[in-house]
Amino acid sequence: MQPSLIPSLLETAAARNGDGRVILYSQGNREDPRSITYRDLLETASKASVAVHNHQNYTPGAAVLLHFNNHLDNIVWFWAVLLAGCIPAITPAFSNNPVQRVANLEHLSSTLITDWCLTSQALLVEFAGQDAIEPVSVETLGWEKASPDSNTASVKAKPTDTALLLFTSGSTGKSKAVCLSHFQIVSAIAGKLSVVPLPEQSSFLNWVGLDHVAAIIEIHLQALYADLDQVHVPGSDVISDPIWFLDLMATHRVSRTFAPNFFLARIRDALVQNARSASPRQWDLSGLRYVASGGEANTTKTCDELSQLLKSFGAPLNVIVPGFGMTETCAGAIFNTNCPDYDKKHGLEYTSVGSCMPGIFMRVTNQQGDPLPPGEMGSLELAGPVVFRQYLNNPAATQESFTMDGWFKTGDCGTLDENGYLVLGGRAKETIIINGVKYSPHEIETAVEEHNIKGLSRSFTCCFSSLSPGAETEEIVLVYLPTYAPEDIPARAATADAISKVVLMSTGSRPHIIPLEQALLPKSTLGKLSRSKIKAAYERGEYRTHDSINRSLIARHRQATRASPKNDFEKGLLEIFLRSFKISEDEFDVQTPIFDVGIDSIELINLKRDIEQHLGFADATIPIIILLENTTVRELAAALDNLYRPKEYNPVVTLQAHGDKNPLWLVHPGAGEVLIFINLAKFITDRPVYALRARGFDEGEKPFDSIEDAVTSYYNGVKSKQPHGPYALAGYCYGSMLAFEVAKKLEENGDEVRFVGSFNLPPHIKMRMRELDWKECLLHLAYFLDLITQKRSRELAVELDGLDQDTILQAIIDEADKERYAQLSLSRPFLSRWADVAYELHRIAGDYDPDGRVASMDVFFSIPLAIAAASKSEWRNVHLSQWDDFTRSHVRFHDVPGEHYSMIGPEHVFAFQKILRSALAERGM
């Protein structure tokens, strides 16, 4: 029979199985844990409850604060307070900041309406500086001599009464006391146990403080309910040594434990290192069924890799169970028991958190509170017996947290897929908005940590937005824990540069970076940083001194190492760069590459225009290729000095020069230009990225007169930069055909081409090429550049039919969006040349028939042009699938978001680059 009150859990476990144990490891002690049976725990807690009942501050049914720094004390006094007829309220670790610590104690006192706290002698000092709460040392109570039979608690609880108070993390402000009832907790435990059956003679493993809902309910109380042993270890010992975590699971035949994503990654890394050792360790993990994971987003890649490793030691493949839960839901209540297969099958970068256990229901709603259909992002709401009913003494917060029809508003965003699985999208209140674009702070933090930046401590990175007085948009603030010594200024500057570049790549915005000492970056018992608390401290000015010192040291370093202009021309250009990018000389000198400051294609064009105005050019006479090939002030000055000297055409444009992997070569679309690749290249930091640009843009250049002419030019360009393979080439639209032909030529000459990518182009294109005359090429170019809409381009195709080129050109210029036209620094002569290049590229492909084969091909397909196919499935299955006729292995297809003209544009480039990088890796590149 299911117990209805929490004390019954311990009483039943003690009576049913006197040998069931709580096994406790103290800090630093790995060999000799303390073991206490459930029967002995009940006897000890009963004695302690007498001391609680007899204390002068005792009030039946009231909340009693508990503040201890070890598992045993928390467990004993949790039960003592319950058995005394009171409500235990377990506090998290107090802040190291005296001001914050006092404020927190005063807040706890007013919330709980209590003036005392049970603690240990060693922790009394933490209550200094305040009068709101009186610490009572349990060592002074003389409870060991009490008779367990003398407990005369007069309060008889009901299932709906509050059994336990736990505190929210405060991620949305001051912590709130969550009222968890007996019925709610028992319902939650029963629901959790039904998700994954656990073997007999196994145990639960906990490594976080009992103040966390996962430790007290998901481990301690659930183990009692399941009649299984439970093992408690200090978190710092486990996190510092993942191998010991594996030892514990094997030694105690652990069936259920938990680990957030950051710790899963550490376990994976430890196992990989173990496999490389001369004598690899082995573990029997055949009893392991359930590694719950939550508290932060789980990456499918990490879960997949670790699952495979754990499987080799006897665990099931689905042993890692990502989930969702809150203090308000008694920890995990939504679980994905099909990870990683489900997430891989659905192409999820971050795992789904699954479906509801018994006792809870979920829905996703819009801003009006209406439930949304599968696939649409909205607000996550929960209901059911497992969900709490109120925050203690906080009716305003309670009312705000529930809808009119009684659903709990979690504050998280998510979508439900067609199978009812939940995919989270971050907390609504944590979203960063920069210039109208929304970013997830977690994704920015992940991006920074995934780059393994030297000088930055993993898992101590926190990102948030802040609106400075007078600012029109928020700025991104990123704080981190450095690994370098405070006096190592070069490392300080290099770390800031590396972080800045990653954030710029992720958001297009330069971050405000502050290194902080560890005391200012406290973690919860689950190893999480509180974004809201850190943000609040920043906005209160608590990091101002650290920020000022950091800025001063880096500025001094820049001044000592910066390269100064050699002449007035370089000085003038440098001033233009600084003004265009809105940065200071401390951040940029004559030898800083422009792409290191996160420049995009629009900023590049604006820079070009500013330089032309500075030089007094009446027309746009500086080819964009000059800026693409000469990315520093010094290089550009030399290039401009030679601008009017005869220059041989070079198709190679360096978009990203760094990285130790083989380069990626990107071939222009039908417009011939490579600006479309600039945003994509910013995300590819592990290898150089080169683009191949068509001939004919510069004054005096003639466009290609045949496919062979273009292929030979591009082949020579590739060989000049990368003499040896393996090669990776990809083309966007029209460029896919050229990438295919260049790949064939490389293979014919004995080179290995390991990756050929087609961005949304089928192999047979000549009929489409023949349809595009000069007018159509110009109209497509105008639409591609966002000068006119697609609808208007189709209308103009009819209206301008039969007119001469000059008339057509002027008509399109007249129709063009004037702001966009100016933004792109276009001129009539240059737009005309651009149309010539596009037309000649299409003309020479009018008789193109693909032949031959390459080793492999990856096709990235998006929503096609309406004229090309009626649907995405038709596009893939009928047209793109024909690439199979021209490869020596089956084509790999990659479904990417967006439409043909937007698939690598700003809206979709972040998703596209992740798919592209994964495809490169799968090809061994």
Curated annotation (Swiss-Prot):
Q: What reaction gets catalysed by this protein? A: 2 3-(4-hydroxyphenyl)pyruvate + AH2 + 2 ATP + O2 = aspulvinone E + A + 2 AMP + CO2 + 2 diphosphate + H2O + H(+)
The biological process GO terms on file are: fatty acid biosynthetic process
UniProt family annotation: Belongs to the NRP synthetase family.
Species annotation: Aspergillus terreus (strain NIH 2624 / FGSC A1156)
**Free-text function comment from the UniProt entry:** Nonribosomal peptide synthase; part of the gene cluster that mediates the biosynthesis of Asp-melanin, a pigment that confers resistance against UV light and hampers phagocytosis by soil amoeba. The nonribosomal peptide synthase melA converts 4-hydroxyphenylpyruvate (4-HPPA) to aspulvinone E. The tyrosinase tyrP then performs hydroxylations of both aromatic moieties of aspulvinone E. The product of tyrP is highly unstable, and, due to the high reactivity of methides and ortho-diquinones, the polymeric Asp-melanin forms spontaneously.
Q: Which PROSITE patterns match?
A: AMP_BINDING (PS00455), CARRIER (PS50075)
Q: Which residues carry this modification: O-(pantetheine 4'-phosphoryl)serine?
A: S601
What SMART domains does its record include? PKS_PP
Q: Where in the cell is it found?
A: Cytoplasm
Family annotation (InterPro entries): AB_hydrolase_fold, ACP-like_sf, AMP-bd_C_sf, AMP-binding_CS, AMP-dep_synth/lig_dom, ANL_N_sf, PKS_PP-bd, PP-bd_ACP
Q: Name the source's superkingdom.
A: Eukaryota
Upregulation details from the record are: Expression is induced during conidiation.
Thioesterase (TE) domain as annotated region, ranges: 663-923
The gene that this protein is the product of is melA
Q: What is this protein called in UniProt?
A: Aspulvinone E synthetase melA
